[in-house]
Regions:
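Bacterial N-terminal signal peptides that target proteins for export
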Residues: 2-12
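Bacterial N-terminal signal peptides
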Residues: 10-22
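N-terminal, post-signal peptide beta-strand-biased segments of exported outer-membrane/organellar beta-barrel
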Residues: 22-152
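Outer-membrane beta-barrel porins/channels
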Residues: 25-42, 50, 101, 106, ...
Length: 320
C-alpha cells in the first residue's frame, strides 16, 4: 500500500510539471558545441547539470563538485544544408516568369569559423574541430565552489564553394559565433537539498556575411517589361524624355528582377561581451531534482567593416 501511494505521488508530480510547462523558443545556432555531455542528452540538463559545464546550463550544479576538478572536451562538427528550388503555378514577378533559379539545386558546402581578432579564414574546411576546457575548486568544508570554463554557446559557419550556387542569394558565406573565453562562476550549497549559483561568461562575439542579392519585386519587373517594349537594343528612344529616362541607361541599365543586383559583405565583432547565468537546484530526494536557470541576454555592439557593391544594372539605370 505504501509503494502504491508513492507511485501515485510521483505520477501526480509529473502531471503537475507537464501541465505547467510553457512554450520555448530555440535556434539552430545555440548550444551545438557547448557541451558534449549535454548535447547527447538533448541539452535537457537543467535539473541535472553536468559537472563544470553547469556554468552554462545551471550554475547551481557547481555545488555538487568536490575538491579540484578539470574538464576537457573535444568535438568535430559538419554542418550541411541542402535545397531544391521550384516555382509555383502562375508564378510571375511583374510579368517575368522564367526564374533561372527554378529547377536547380544547391551545390558544394564547406565549414568555416570566426577567428577572434582575425576574422574568417580565406578558405573553408570539410570538418570543424574544437575543444573545451574548464576548472573548478571547492575548499575543504566550504559550501562554495569556484569555477571557470571556455566553451562555445553559439556557433554556425558555412561557405558555399560553388560560385554559381543558386542559394548564393541566401548567403554565400555566413558565420555567427560566440566564444566564451572566461566565465568566473560560483556555486553555493545552502543545505543538502538546495543549491544556488551564478556565472558571468565573458565572450567574443563574431558575425560575418557574404551574400549576393537580387530584388525580385513587381515594380522592378514592370519597369523592365516597359524597357523591353520601348527601348531598342542599340540605343535610346526619341520619346524617352517622356518616359523619365527609361532607356538612358543603355543595355546594361535594363532591369530584370532575377538578375544579381548587388553583393553585401559584413565582418563585425565584439571583443568583450558579458552576460549572466543564475540558477537554482532543489534535490528533495535522490530520485528527483528540480532546476531553474536564468540566462541574461546579450546586447553586444559589434564593430567592423561593411561593403555594398551594386551591379551595373542598378548603377546604369540610376545614372540614366
Amino acid at each position: 500500500m505504501l509503494r502504491s501511494k508513492r507511485w501515485v505521488r510521483r505520477a501526480a508530480g509529473m502531471i503537475v510539471a507537464l501541465a505547467g510547462a510553457g512554450s520555448v523558443q530555440a535556434a539552430m545556432t545555440e548550444n551545438l558545441a557547448t557541451s558534449v555531455t549535454a548535447m547527447s542528452l538533448g541539452n535537457a540538463v537543467t535539473a541535472d547539470p553536468p559537472g563544470i559545464e553547469s556554468i552554462h546550463f545551471n550554475p547551481a550544479g557547481l555545488a555538487r563538485l568536490e575538491g579540484k576538478q578539470k574538464y576537457d572536451s573535444f568535438f568535430a562538427a559538419r554542418f550541411r544544408a541542402w535545397a531544391e528550388f521550384s516555382k509555383p503555378e502562375g508564378f510571375s514577378i511583374g510579368g517575368w516568369t522564367d526564374d533561372p533559379v527554378a529547377g536547380t539545386k544547391t551545390g558544394n558546402f564547406g565549414q568555416t569559423l570566426y577567428v577572434p581578432f582575425r576574422g574568417v579564414p580565406g578558405s573553408s574546411f570539410p570538418v570543424l574541430v574544437g575543444a573545451g576546457l574548464g576548472f573548478s575548486y571547492k575548499p575543504d568544508n566550504s559550501p562554495f565552489t569556484f569555477a571557470t570554463a571556455t566553451y562555445l554557446p553559439q556557433a554556425v559557419g558555412f561557405e558555399r564553394t560553388d560560385a554559381d550556387d543558386p542559394a548564393r542569394f541566401d548567403g554565400r558565406m555566413a558565420v555567427i559565433q560566440r566564444l566564451v573565453y572566461l566565465s568566473p562562476s560560483v556555486g553555493y550549497k545552502v543545505n543538502d537539498q538546495l543549491s544556488v549559483g551564478i556565472a558571468v561568461p565573458i565572450a567574443h562575439q563574431g558575425f560575418a556575411l557574404d551574400t549576393d542579392m537580387r530584388t525580385p519585386n513587381d515594380f522592378l519587373g514592370i519597369v523592365g517589361k516597359l524597357q523591353q517594349g520601348f527601348c531598342p537594343e542599340d540605343g535610346g528612344n526619341p520619346i524617352d524624355m517622356f518616359l523619365f529616362g527609361l532607356c538612358s541607361g543603355g543595355k546594361e541599365g535594363r532591369l530584370n528582377p532575377f538578375k544579381k543586383a548587388a553583393r553585401m559583405q559584413i565582418d563585425a565583432s565584439a571583443a568583450v561581451d558579458l552576460t549572466m547565468n543564475a540558477g537554482v537546484l532543489w534535490e528533495p530526494y535522490d530520485w528527483i531534482s528540480l532546476g531553474g536557470v536564468y540566462r541574461g541576454g546579450s546586447d553586444a555592439v559589434l564593430r567592423g567593416t561593411y561593403r555594398f557593391d551594386t551591379e551595373p544594372m542598378l548603377r546604369e539605370f540610376s545614372a540614366g
